[in-house]
């Protein structure tokens, strides 16, 4: 039981909703009867890829010397000596294997389009911190984060249901993708000095803390606009209220307070999906 609890924490369970939200949002925007088995497998596959991405990220950040014991961010298992490198590599293989098994069913349902999406998703999850050309170190992770935790996931989910492109699902996914970028931004603003020291050229490192904060404000505004477009109802403008509250908290944050901001943005993602659920029934 203790070992299960340990690995559950290593997988960063709080992050799983970031991968689940565009899948759920896409299904809600679809507004039609869905094939439940396909929807469930889609959700599990997305979450498996998220776990794989988390584990790979932990492994390569440790190998590169980016993660160290006593860091200001959430505890990292390798850096703290909780698990060793061999165990982490094995966990990466297991997570990827689960995603591939689930993905095989989705390819059978959706064909070559889903195969392409799946291959790119797994590839970018690996490339995020792996190899000398890792996306996180090149400063383009925000774009990939928006796409694959947003419109790619939501539109792909609906394509599996009807083999058609859904603009509503695309917009709903864009809203989720924006919040995912805010989660990443909270992490990167917090780690700006540590990342600069190891050559990790994130957006805050390249353009500064102020530019990153302004970027978050614009992204939050865009998320509400996409939500309204996806569900065609102006009452979703109420999402501006929690957006403003969390943005003010982000501006005031220092050090480990960014960890609270990060988790609050995850909760904001939950709120968005709940709001989409209400919009679905109205």
Predicted regions and their residues:
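Intramembrane alpha-helical segments
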Residues: 76-164
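Extended hydrophobic alpha-helices typical of membrane-associated regions
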Residues: 229-282
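Membrane-embedded alpha-helical segments that form the functional core of polytopic membrane enzymes
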Residues: 32-59, 115-123, 166-186
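Small-residue-rich segments of transmembrane alpha-helices in multi-pass membrane proteins
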Residues: 17-26, 143-158, 204-209, 263-277
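Multi-pass membrane catalytic core of lipid/isoprenoid biosynthesis enzymes
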Residues: 70-112, 200-232
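Functional transmembrane core segments of multi-pass inner-membrane proteins
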Residues: 144-192, 210-213
């Amino acid at each position: 039981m203790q070992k299960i609890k340990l690995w559950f924490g290593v997988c960063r369970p709080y992050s799983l909703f970031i991968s689940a939200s565009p899948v759920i949002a896409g299904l809600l925007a679809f507004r039609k009867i869905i094939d439940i088995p396909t929807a469930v497998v889609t959700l599990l596959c997305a979450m498996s890829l998220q776990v794989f991405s988390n584990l790979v990220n932990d492994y390569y950040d440790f190998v590169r010397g980016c993660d160290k014991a006593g860091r200001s961010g959430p505890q990292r298992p390798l850096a703290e000596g909780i698990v060793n490198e061999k165990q982490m590599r094995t966990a990466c293989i297991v997570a990827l294997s689960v995603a591939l098994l689930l993905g095989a069913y989705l390819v059978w349902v959706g064909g070559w389009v889903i195969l392409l999406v799946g291959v790119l998703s797994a590839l970018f999850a690996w490339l995020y911190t792996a190899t000398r050309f890792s996306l996180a170190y090149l400063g383009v992770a925000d774009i990939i984060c928006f796409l694959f935790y947003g419109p790619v996931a939501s539109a792909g989910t609906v394509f599996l249901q009807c083999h058609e492109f859904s603009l509503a699902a695309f917009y709903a996914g864009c809203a989720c993708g924006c919040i995912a970028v805010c989660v990443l931004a909270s992490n990167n603003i917090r780690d700006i000095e540590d990342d600069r020291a190891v050559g990790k050229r994130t957006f805050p490192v390249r353009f500064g803390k102020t530019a990153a904060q302004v970027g978050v404000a614009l992204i939050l505004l865009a998320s509400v606009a996409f939500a309204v477009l996806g569900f065609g109802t102006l009452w979703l403008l109420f999402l501006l209220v929690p957006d403003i509250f969390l943005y003010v908290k982000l501006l005031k944050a220092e050090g480990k307070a960014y960890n609270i901001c990060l988790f609050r943005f995850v909760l904001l993602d939950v709120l968005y999906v709940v709001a989409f659920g209400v919009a679905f029934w109205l």
